[in-house]
Design a protein with these regions (language model features):
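Active-site entrance/lid segments in N-terminal catalytic domains of soluble metabolic enzymes
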Residues: 1-170
Length: 170
């Protein structure tokens, strides 16, 4: 993750007058994105088991005046994320011997890790441990936190609740 990831991509989208998308698993809040970026914005919504979390995220995105809600429908199972398993990727990142060696070979990574803002998942941090300092694999997150029983009725309800442009994202 680049410390300025979503901000930089959003500014590039604005510069080229194109739509910008941000995920529920982004490291920058929808409120900050909305205040920084003046271009059409899409939010990638993950359907969680915790309906309170779903409602809270929906309200934040609506209040931030995003233009499109895209419901992610292909992550209700974690999948075999071989690269993540091989590299030991977790969210938030944790220091291991392997990651320390990577940092040593790329000194700016280490400098940015130590000097830039703390890695957070602002849309989740008040609801699930995966938004805190507890490291988890992305596959584990998808398998345990997302609602594997999501149905067309759930999608229809979200679309109605959103009340604006709505898309399904595979």
């Amino acid at each position: 993750f680049h410390y300025d990831g979503e901000r930089a991509v959003g500014k590039a989208a604005q510069k080229f007058n194109t739509m910008f998308g941000v995920s529920a698993l982004s490291t920058v809040s929808v409120e900050e994105i909305s205040s920084l970026i003046n271009t059409p914005k899409m939010f990638q919504f993950y359907f969680h088991k915790d309906r309170g979390l779903n409602d809270a995220v929906m309200e934040r995105v609506k209040a931030a005046k995003f233009d499109v809600m895209a419901l992610t429908v292909d992550t209700i199972t974690g999948g075999n994320r071989e690269r993540d398993l091989r590299t030991g990727f977790t969210s938030p990142p944790k220091l291991t011997l392997s990651s320390l060696l990577s940092f040593a070979s790329k000194p700016m990574w280490g400098i940015n890790y130590l000097t830039k803002g703390k890695f957070e998942l602002p849309h989740l941090q008040d609801h699930v441990s995966e938004g805190t300092d507890i490291a988890t694999s992305i596959g584990n997150y998808f398998s345990t936190m997302l609602d594997q029983s999501m149905s067309w009725k759930d999608a229809e309800k979200l679309c109605s609740q959103w009340g604006g442009h709505f898309a399904l994202k595979g």
